[in-house]
Amino acid sequence: MTSRTATEEPLPAASPRYQQLQARLGVGWNTWDVHSVTTQVLLPDGLAIHVGLKHNSTLYGDAFLGDALIGRLTPGAEQVFPGPHAWEGGYTDLRLSWKGHDLRLQTAHDGANVVMLATPLPSQPLSALPATIVFSVNYLWGRPGSVVKEARRIEARSPLHTVAVYCTCKKAPERALAEDVNLPVSDAYFSTDFVQPVGVSSGAPLSIERIEAIIERARQNYAQSVARSGKSAEVVDAIQTVLGWDTIYEPEGRRVLSPVSRVWSVSWGGYVIFDWDTFFAATMASIGDRDLAYADAIETLRSETQQGFVPNYARSGGWKSSDRSEPPVGAITVLGIYQRFHDRWFLEEAFTPLLRWNRWWAAHRDIQGYLTWGSDGTNAPANLDDTARGTRAGAILESGLDNSPMYDDAAYDAATHKLEFADVGLMSMYIADCDALATMADILGEPAAAKEIRERSARYRVKLETLWNSDAGIFLNKDLRTGQFSLRLSPTNFYPLLAKAATPQQAEVMIKNHLLNPKEFWGEWIIPSIARNDPAFKDQNYWRGRIWGPMNYLVYLGLRNYDQPEVSRQFAEKSYDLFLQEWKKNGHVHENYNGLTGTGDDVQSSDRFYHWGALLGYIQYLNETEPLPSPTAVR
């Protein structure tokens, strides 16, 4: 048995400036607890108010719901329909359905305090008895504090604050003893039959009418703030909402960040940072919360391995994929955020780890001057439960495209730990990464680094040009064993547009003959992760034909580099139409979508609240708010 401490990797020390940022983020009431969207937590104390629901019966079948997550798919699980979630948690709203009970839970800030309002909704109860709603209070994460229930309040005392919690709960005398004895709650709590609205307040006892008024004021403030975005209001609401619900406090690192969905994070022990997923969360957060955008980008970089690369994943316990990385989108993310806010310290914080990562690709993933994916199982420390490390499967996972048909025939060289497969997408993303990083070096006054990076970019740009196939009219991946081009097309074949590596003439051919070709990529729902005429498209299984926000986003950024305003506009609008379909219907932000029907609910392998699905809306936000750049930089 391997000891825990033998292989866990601690986080690097944070700079004073970044510590200050985290201190600003990690304060006040919000849905900080990864385990439940119905829990309100006060930071930095760690004081939590949990909402529980007990299903009662006169026969058998009693059950208790102590936590709730968006998108849980196990049989009989609660169904959560997320509503607005302000960046700082000043207003939240959700609906929950479980065992025939339906409720609405709203919260709002009242100065430094919080109010919570639970309202029963019309439903089809499964028993003769009403549900019992429970509000319990404790301290999370081993934080010091004591909680005492008194006659009319629960008082919580920590070294930082003393907080009194009150409830409008009213219990019938004949029900009180049974409720107190039989609820499966070990902490101090309030409980009542859930037959009318119930309110909870911290700081002072408030009437239900006063709580409702505070909630309504917060709701109006949220609506007004979103409305100020004009025609982009709907997408701003969606991005703010998905990132609001997906942002948590991570107690191991004492940090606020936006890992992927809570369902994923819980199953990975409390949190999981995937490289490009969390970089893209940072990009989207930049439309409304600068500190959160910085935190998501910096925390992704702080997860780097001993070898100097950002791993495929970094999870609870300090475990990482030391064998493999993921797509190099860090520099374009950081530079894009910098260009919104122009905070030099942010570039200074990010530049050194980005440069290490950029150098690592060239040193460890180069075959014959081409970049390819890989997985080196000899890297330490080894994650022993990760059976993909040092295998062909691990090398494909480095692409982020776990089961893409592009790699069905790609060979893995166990001696070099690499796929023998020149990858158009990787080379294009890497060149774009180099160009963004060189610009950062210019801003920071690092001429030697800028020269080094541009030389590397130029070298790989020359090699990428050799992957242009004039017969196919597109850049093609290449089997480095046989020298044969692969005719299996995915959105990554358009990534040379992102790197400005295609000539205007090549871009025109690629767009006309392939992107706008309904037999390949165009259609009502765009764009599939493999061409529609590929045999694997019919699988509609993960990266085998489904539509993914990050692919659309990178292709759209590429289109913006060329004089294709109408195609860019249509691409953005079609992406947004796809996103809105289930956002409006169910409040879902899907991990991926069916390439034929545009739905995400048709399979279990599409998380219902995965923030990068909102990139489909972010594309439209860019289309509406940022003018297309001049294409003159493209040769």
Where are these regions (language model features)?
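The feature captures the catalytic groove of carbohydrate-active enzymes
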Residues: 181-203, 307, 311-329, 335-345, ...
